UniProtKB/Swiss-Prot annotation:
The gene is ligB. GO terms for molecular function: DNA ligase (NAD+) activity. InterPro entries: DNA_ligase_B, DNAligase_adenylation, DNAligase_N, NA-bd_OB-fold, NAD_dep_DNA_ligaseB, NAD_DNA_ligase_OB, RuvA_2-like. This is DNA ligase B. Catalyzes the formation of phosphodiester linkages between 5'-phosphoryl and 3'-hydroxyl groups in double-stranded DNA using NAD as a coenzyme and as the energy source for the reaction. Transmembrane segments: none annotated.
Length: 567
């Protein structure tokens, strides 16, 4: 048995375990030479910087926030593997904005989970929670109550001038009576929604819609549907109560309506869950927890501050890293490609393997070990490949096996050479629910029989004695006797189940004797309900195949139901 066949067979033994429960570490260091990991870190870092620049300068990114955040986490892991410092939060954002912000935009550091939230809140007081509105960050500048600048965030220090768009955004007051002589506000321009429920509808591309309207040269009618959520008032009132009250008076009502005091992490958890489910006038992607005490505006920098933190909602898209690629040969001779991924939890299921279909489809995806893919759960919790979001710089060439000689009527025996994978798949099907449904008998048991040369064809197990079964390591006499009795009882299974177990290409029940089935002509099969000409040809090819007839002759000697010779 060659190495490739052994790899395929061993994978078949566990390929039915698609999702498993239990904790598993996913943040592991790749088994790469130091030179390669340095190259991969540099490549991923550059790509993240490009996406970040697009996000902050143009209001949209080729990837979602979920994908960006998860790849940023991966970069941190790789950097820690090399002993490099985490620069992801302090990295300046490249930008071409020409207009200086009176106060820099600090951005937000993201909390990973409830434990991180609890740790950050410890020792802090006067904390508030707000929805993290998903929109376009801006600065509003008022002189003597008059709006004089509307600036995009840009790189946090300089942004683009969108002031000419402000009159078309009714949510932005053009003049504020009794405002401070110099008023600088930072907030989010968002698409006004009617009862948007984040848990049900997700992001609906709202931020990109707003960004597109702002970036257009001529005013867009969409600007009338834009709201504003003020989340920072540098050098403003010292208490949040006073701050939100004054903002409401000045014409910014959303901040007061969606700011809540919190005493513990449990309060944050409750508000986060509530806003995730509740109908809201904007799209959100998490919550922001902030403390009242802030440094003076002159100390703010274009890096995340320590007085506010974001705790995002669970990602809608999940990234998995491809660990290996397996090629499996099914019982009908069709090859499939299964990606082995570093374990990832989606909902309540841990995903370790993803079937992506044929070799042709795998080649179209161009997936190699180390690539990062997005996964979702399809029907019955089966993982589905959605996209490839990051390809490693160094791509190892993988050659798929040549399966041209395998088909629906090949490998009813262990030999000739190369048949082991398909033969094993046939045995797994035979004992499974689609065949004879022999409880407790699966791929592992069949592989042991093959390994110890106790079985050479699809029905040879009927000749095994309890002593032969007990000779397999790990199977004692009691279990061997039980298996033997199961095998003997299988002889009394209905004839239709035996046909399906052998691979009979028929989806409807067949209730007859083997000799009767064998004598039916092609035209007789074709006229039967649910069959047709194509399926009839498949049936005749199956029945006339010498290997199948040899199996039927053997089953006749074993007095299996339906195969007995009749006079």
């Amino acid at each position: 048995m060659n190495i490739l066949n052994l790899k395929i067979i061993m994978f078949l033994l566990i390929s039915n375990i698609i999702v498993v429960g239990g904790a598993w570490a996913t943040s592991t260091c790749p088994d790469w030479p130091a030179t390669r990991i340095a190259v991969e870190i540099n490549a991923l870092e550059q790509q993240l910087n490009k996406w970040s620049a697009a996000y902050h300068q143009q209001g949209h990114s080729p990837v979602t926030d979920d994908i960006y955040d998860q790849l940023q986490d991966k970069l941190r892991v790789w950097q820690s593997c090399r002993g490099l410092p985490d620069k992801t939060e302090s990295q300046p954002i490249p930008g071409k904005g020409q207009f200086l912000h009176p106060v820099a935009h600090t951005g937000l550091k993201k909390l990973k989970d409830e434990t991180a939230l609890t740790r950050w809140m410890a020792g802090r007081k006067n904390l508030w929670v707000q929805p993290k509105v998903d929109g376009v960050a801006v600065t509003l500048v008022y002189h003597g109550g008059k709006l004089v600048q509307l600036l995009s965030r840009g790189n946090g220090v300089k942004g683009q001038n969108w002031t000419e768009k402000a009159p078309f955004i009714s949510a932005i007051p053009q003049y504020i009576a009794n405002a401070p002589a110099l008023l600088t506000l930072q907030g989010e321009l968002f698409l006004l929604m009617d009862g948007h429920q984040q848990a049900k509808s997700g992001g609906v591309n709202a931020r990109s819609t707003v960004a597109g309207a702002l970036m257009r040269k001529s005013p867009s009618p969409l600007l009338a549907q834009v709201g504003v959520f003020i989340w920072a008032w540098p050098d403003g009132p010292t208490t949040m109560k006073e701050k939100v009250a004054l903002l409401q008076v000045m014409g910014f009502p959303f901040t007061a309506k969606y700011s809540e005091p919190v005493m513990s992490h449990l309060d944050v958890v409750q508000w986060r869950q509530f806003w995730f489910q509740a109908p809201l006038p904007f799209v959100t992607d998490g919550v922001v927890v902030r403390q009242e005490e802030e440094p003076a505006g002159r100390y703010w920098q274009a890096t995340p501050g320590q007085w506010s933190m974001a705790w995002k909602y669970p990602p809608l898209q999940h990234i998995a890293e491809v660990k290996d690629i397996h090629f499996t040969l099914g019982r009908t001779g069709k090859g499939t490609v299964v990606l082995e991924v570093l374990p990832i939890k989606i909902d309540d299921k841990w995903i370790r393997r993803v079937n992506i279909g044929s070799v042709t489809r795998w080649k179209q995806w161009d997936i190699a070990p180390g690539d990062h893919i997005t996964l979702a759960l399809a029907g019955h919790g089966i993982p589905r490949l959605d996209n490839v979001v990051w390809r490693v710089h160094q791509r190892n060439t993988i050659t798929a096996p040549n399966w041209d000689k395998f088909h629906q009527l090949s490998c009813f025996q262990r030999l000739p050479h190369g048949c082991e994978p398909q033969f094993l798949s046939r045995l797994i099907w035979l004992s499974g629910p689609g065949g004879l449904d022999i409880g407790g008998i699966g791929g592992g048991f069949w592989q042991e029989l093959i390994h110890h040369e106790l079985i050479n064809d699809l029905v040879g197990w009927l000749l095994l004695t309890p002593e032969q079964i007990a000779s397999i390591p790990g199977i004692g006499n009691a279990r061997a006797e039980k298996i033997y009795q199961q095998f003997q009882r299988a002889k009394q299974q209905p004839f239709s189940r035996w046909l399906l177990a052998l691979g009979f290409p028929q989806v409807v029940s067949v209730d007859a004797q083997w000799q009767v089935v064998l004598r039916r002509s092609l035209s007789e099969w074709a006229t039967m309900a649910g069959i047709g000409q194509m399926r009839a040809k498949q049936i005749k090819h199956f029945l006339d195949h010498p290997d199948v007839q040899a199996l039927a002759d053997f089953l006749s000697t074993q007095k299996v139901v339906g195969f007995e010779l009749t006079e």
